[in-house]
């Protein structure tokens, strides 16, 4: 493969576009099925979408299966800049040598250009950034929320204001794991679509159960049959 280089900002913007298009970081081709379970197509990896956008000739398989070129929108540009600032300031700083991943990310984000064989590192950064922000939000919230269940198990909720603090694509299911705050209580549920961090209205839901957070130990009310609006 060619060692041609591209600007770091350009490649990072494409990584954000690929994340937006795929809805998650896809490291290996993922099958997509219809509602009745019939195979439809393979979803391309974020990395190959980025590569083929910049170098279409890289795709040597059937042309009809080639990924569509990514189109960068203003939100991708803004996210790319936010990611560069975040990783430089908070996650890795100027520390070298902790592990290969951190060392490579430090090197890439400190450089003005990225080689094609480094695209894999850049492709995962939007996902890592989203995960780290979510983990920080949940950790902070776990120290501030009230203990106890939001309501009795089995009871119904309607028209409640919520703050979404985490929305992470599930590795095992077709959906997003949501963490939120309602009435200063932490709640969670599985949602069919991604939700933006911030204000949200729980149009309706039911209380499924209440357990301790697997990592922080605070009470978390699990919801189901959730209809949320933003």
Where are these regions (language model features)?
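N-terminal alpha-helical modules
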Residues: 133, 197-199, 214-220
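Beta-strand/loop nucleic-acid-binding surfaces
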Residues: 174-199
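OB-fold/S1-family single-stranded nucleic acid-binding modules
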Residues: 177-183, 206-230
């Amino acid at each position: 493969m060619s060692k041609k280089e591209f600007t770091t900002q350009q490649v990072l913007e494409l990584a954000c576009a690929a994340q937006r298009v795929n809805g998650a970081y896809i490291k290996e081709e993922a099958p997509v099925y219809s509602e009745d379970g019939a195979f439809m197509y393979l979803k391309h990896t974020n990395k190959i979408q980025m590569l083929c956008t910049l170098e279409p000739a890289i795709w040597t398989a059937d042309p009809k299966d080639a990924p569509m070129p990514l189109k960068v929108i203003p939100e991708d540009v803004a996210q790319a800049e936010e990611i560069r600032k975040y990783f430089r300031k908070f996650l890795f700083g100027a520390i070298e040598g902790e592990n290969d991943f951190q060392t490579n990310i430090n090197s890439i984000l400190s450089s003005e250009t990225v080689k094609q064989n480094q695209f894999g590192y850049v492709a995962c950064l939007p996902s890592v950034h989203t995960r780290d922000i979510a983990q920080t939000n949940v950790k902070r919230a776990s120290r501030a929320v009230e203990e106890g269940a939001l309501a009795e198990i089995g009871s119904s909720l309607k028209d409640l204001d919520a703050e979404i603090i985490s929305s992470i694509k599930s590795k095992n299911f077709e959906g997003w794991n949501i963490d939120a705050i309602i009435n200063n209580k932490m709640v969670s549920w599985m949602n069919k679509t991604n939700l933006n961090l911030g204000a949200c209205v729980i149009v309706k839901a039911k209380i499924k159960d209440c357990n301790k957070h697997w990592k922080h130990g605070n009470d978390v009310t699990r919801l189901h049959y959730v209809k949320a609006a933003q």
